[in-house]
């Protein structure tokens, strides 16, 4: 296959799986060799086995980190610090894209960034939504679920000290009823205690706003 043929086949898709090249009467070994050559030539990036992205200046669309993360591990969604930063709930700029997944924990370094996956139980793989990102789409935890996921996975995450260190802001974006509803799925005193602390933080910030 010629590289221009690959570009035509991929079109505007920012990420592609090698399986799309194996349709029809083709030799898988030759396809793998060709992909390896394109990687070495700097024409494509290998994100993980079988997963690739077109490299500049050939790419039509730069893949969003959230989209990449969704492809790196199936049954995953953006959560924790990445989602909280995306919603403006914490002030920090996050340099690693964090997700939760039913798969194994992983820390992946790719040509397009670093990606971390934390494991959660299958029954907790809820509370996410499809987000539009400049024409791309990715699964991202709702604000409330991103916060609960972080507290659940962080040792001592329910402590008053840790919650204050998060420096939560724009807490009006958090739905109190959703917090109370989603915490029931975790069924753990740790999260119940944390929600009480969060509601107090939200209340105090609301009072501060009213005093201005």
Residue ranges of model-derived segments:
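Short beta-edge/loop segments at beta->alpha junctions of small alpha/beta modules
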Residues: 1-75
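Nucleic-acid-binding surface
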Residues: 54-212
């Amino acid at each position: 296959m010629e590289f221009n043929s690959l570009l035509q086949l991929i079109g505007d898709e920012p990420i592609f799986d090698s399986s799309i090249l194996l349709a029809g009467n083709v030799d898988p070994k030759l396809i793998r060799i060709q992909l390896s050559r394109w990687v070495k030539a700097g024409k494509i990036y290998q994100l993980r086995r079988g997963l690739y992205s077109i490299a500049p200046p050939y790419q039509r669309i730069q893949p969003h980190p959230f989209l990449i993360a969704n492809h790196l591990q199936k049954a995953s969604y953006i959560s924790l610090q990445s989602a909280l930063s995306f919603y403006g709930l914490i002030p920090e700029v996050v340099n690693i894209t964090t997700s939760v997944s039913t798969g194994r924990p992983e820390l992946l370094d790719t040509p397009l960034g670093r990606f971390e996956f934390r494991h959660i139980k299958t029954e907790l793989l809820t509370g996410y939504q499809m987000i539009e990102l400049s024409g791309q789409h990715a699964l991202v935890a709702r604000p409330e679920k991103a916060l609960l996921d972080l507290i659940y996975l962080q040792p001592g995450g329910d402590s008053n000290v840790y919650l204050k260190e998060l420096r939560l802001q724009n807490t009006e974006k958090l739905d109190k009823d959703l917090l109370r509803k989603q915490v029931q799925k975790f069924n753990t005193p740790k999260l119940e205690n944390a929600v009480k602390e969060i509601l107090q933080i939200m209340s105090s910030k609301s009072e501060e706003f009213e005093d201005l």
